[in-house]
Amino acid sequence: MKDMGRKARRAATVLAVMSSEQKNKALEMIALSLEAHSDEILRANHQDLLNATQNNLTVAMVDRLKLNEVRLCTIIDSVRQVACLPDPVGQVMDEWTRPNGLHISRVRTPLGVIGIIYESRPNVTIDASTLCLKAGNAAILRGGSDSFHSAHALHCALVKGLKKAGFPKDAIQMVATKDRGAVGEMLKGLDGAIDVIVPRGGKNLVARIQVDARVPIFAHLEGLCHIYIDQSADLDMARNIVLNAKLRRTGICSAVETVLIDRQALEKFLPILTALQKKGCEIRATEDIVFLMPDAKLAFEEDWSHEYLDAIVSVKTVESVEGAIAHIKRYSSGHTESIIAEDMEIVEKFFNHLDSAILLHNASTQFADGGEFGFGAEIGIATGKMHARGPIGVEQLTSFQYHIKGNGQVRP
């Protein structure tokens, strides 16, 4: 593992000075290599899916793991989208001239070596690698055992693309073992080789990393997203948004887990809950809702803080936007919250009083995604308050330097 760290550090010094044209060529070579090896990648994924069935993984977990031609094409498209993004390295973030004539610029620079620890999503292999590459960083990947074959097939194709572009193969390395001890070694930083760790996985994985990491991390513990439906909301709009936010893909961190409804308009919005039930979604709700919907289950305290990642949703009535804000402040993970309302004063209050990384108005929580933000792809979502917050794209994978130019100044 420490040898991987040394190799990554050497590769990072090469990547840091690569031109935009060189990096974009490498990304195109990676896309072409993924296309050329798509059959091998899908066969490897099929093996992971067979193992998942034998290991009794949930439907949501299998969906996270699954690749098909459409999803693989989406991954390949995302590589080309990253190539089209502006190169952050060398961008002047700000500049000014001091009274003594010194000209000071704050300039974006690569972070160095990024450690990516993830579980069952094969696409993270490519998303993380290409974003790191675009930002001039080397990466060390450690995928989960569920996606072991898929991740390695994707990485193999990626490295072939790197070689064709003349890039060091050690720019993107993958830990070739399922041994969990490798994660512990990465969390120690590999003797100073790793600059940042980005975890992408379940609550237990991220919690362990947050406790054990000896290097900085960009992470969120869980999704636990909320939608508040105000009495001023349009019923049809609210129904479409809630159905999408819950059921488009239930197993992703931006899926809504709790819906809060303005108590004064409960009967107006009951058709939303009926529509969810018709789609096979289980409703766990407060007593006033269960009274009107006998098929719904009574919610318990633990439901408000539970990330289901399944076709289950908690529903609660609240006294206006103030009640929604109070509930979200108590239970939110700080990931994503949405308000459906036509009253802009209510919307402004919602936005001004909540501190989650992403706030939406009249839109599905499932837009909490780097691709939807125009970032091309994302490594993950960060809910901390450092410079990387929300979707982690190429800009968030950079640091900065101060470049100071003078003409002989000395300090008095």
Curated annotation (Swiss-Prot):
According to its UniProt entry, what is the function of this protein?
Answer: Catalyzes the NADPH-dependent reduction of L-glutamate 5-phosphate into L-glutamate 5-semialdehyde and phosphate. The product spontaneously undergoes cyclization to form 1-pyrroline-5-carboxylate.
Q: Name one GO cellular component term.
A: cytoplasm
What is this enzyme's EC?
A: 1.2.1.41
This one is known as: Gamma-glutamyl phosphate reductase
Q: Which reaction does it catalyse?
A: L-glutamate 5-semialdehyde + phosphate + NADP(+) = L-glutamyl 5-phosphate + NADPH + H(+)
A Pfam family for this UniProt protein?
A: Aldedh
GO MF entry, a single one: glutamate-5-semialdehyde dehydrogenase activity
Q: Does the keyword Transport apply?
A: no
Asked whether the keyword Signal is assigned, the reply is no
Q: Which PROSITE patterns does this entry report, sorted A to Z?
A: PROA
Where does it reside? Cytoplasm
* Species this protein is from: Bartonella henselae (strain ATCC 49882 / DSM 28221 / CCUG 30454 / Houston 1)
Pathway-wise, it operates in: Amino-acid biosynthesis; L-proline biosynthesis; L-glutamate 5-semialdehyde from L-glutamate: step 2/2
Its GO biological process terms? L-proline biosynthetic process
Q: Which family does it belong to?
A: Belongs to the gamma-glutamyl phosphate reductase family.
Query: Any idea which UniProt keywords this protein has?
Result: Amino-acid biosynthesis, Cytoplasm, NADP, Oxidoreductase, Proline biosynthesis
Give the top-level enzyme category: oxidoreductase
